[in-house]
Amino acid sequence: LHWMVHSFPTRRSSDLNVLDYGAVRHDEAVVHGGSRSQFFEFIAGAEFICGHNIFAHDLKYLEKDFANHGLAEAGIIDTLHFSPLLFPRKPYHHLVKNDKLQSDELNNPLNDAIKCKELLLEELEAFNQLKAGFQDILFLLLHNQHEFSAFFKLLNFSGCENDLHKHISTEFADKICKNADLPEIIRANPVELAYCLALINVFDHDFKESPDQSSITPPWVSRNYPDVEKIMFQLRSQQCADGCSYCNQYLDIHSGLKRWFGYDEFRCYDDKPLQEIAVAAVVKENRSILAVFPTGGGKSITFQLPALMAGENAHALTVVISPLQSLMKDQIDNLEHSHHITCAATINGLLDPIERQKAYERVEEGSASILYISPESLRSRSIERLLLGRNIARFVIDEAHCFSAWGQDFRVDYLFIGEFIKQLQQQKQNRRQI
């Protein structure tokens, strides 16, 4: 090896003093203990220093010491930032869960450093296995970004100097909208675009059969780069006015109806295509709508089809607020038994603890694109945390008369729905209206 990598985490006390240092070098030499001087003597002269979540944590406490020990010019590599780019496909990398490095021992910096080195080497190998075109795209988007530049220097990778807009359009033809404003996205959100493209690379449009349907953006990415959700919407869920090969195929509501439900056309009432009008307003125009249908009139399809298409195209979650647990079960059973659609879940009081945990996991991991809950569930902190970790396509209020009709049976938690959505959007720092 012609480079030096020191992978190190630190353990801190509650008063923010560093208690324990750990590092491993490329030649397998290690250091572990509470001696600051021994630690910096060990890492002296490093060209590159690697850690997991090092920018957000370790550097806060050691950056000044780096400068004092001649390490100001060392390249800093954060394995956390590259994990979603290079292992975007579920089950992701076995050493990473959300933003945490999976380790055999708690509070052992040396063990963490060894795992971090292992992860780095696998990330380098994963990058080398990418198609040359996507390697160039990642380089052109990220090589000038502080959190990413050292990785490419370590690889001595320079990429090509192609027109990035044209390069992405070519590599992702038929995978994103041809008329999305790529030049502006590249200018304003290069990191977010990189995370979106990495995930799109593993999308499989045969959504019903593919195990890749549940590959999603890790919650820490959405939290630190909230515009990822907005950009994914622009690339994959916003139908262009001119029409393009992607939008015509994957945002066409008639082909979606056939693909998901097996129907050739929408149902009409008094010769009016009410179902089609409602679905088009959601999918084509991204509008919030009120749809009033007679009992048994096919109302459910007007929100289920857009939800399934949003799950297919952007792996987004649609939250359906329903007044009755039995109604939730009936709709999920109908999707499964009549249409073989298994990406809907419910979390309600009828579930035993094991069933409830499995439902949470399905939503958290991305294998559910429709979630049925009661209005009371919005008071739950666990539900709030769950939804914060997913890209939310929209909220649906099923049986909307429960929301508007006052009386002795009125459930006051319906009044909280609007406030909850507002708070959720503020917490997600998402500039795209839910």
Predicted feature residues:
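Short, conserved "post-DEAD/DEAH" coupling segment immediately C-terminal to helicase motif II
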Residues: 385-390, 405-432
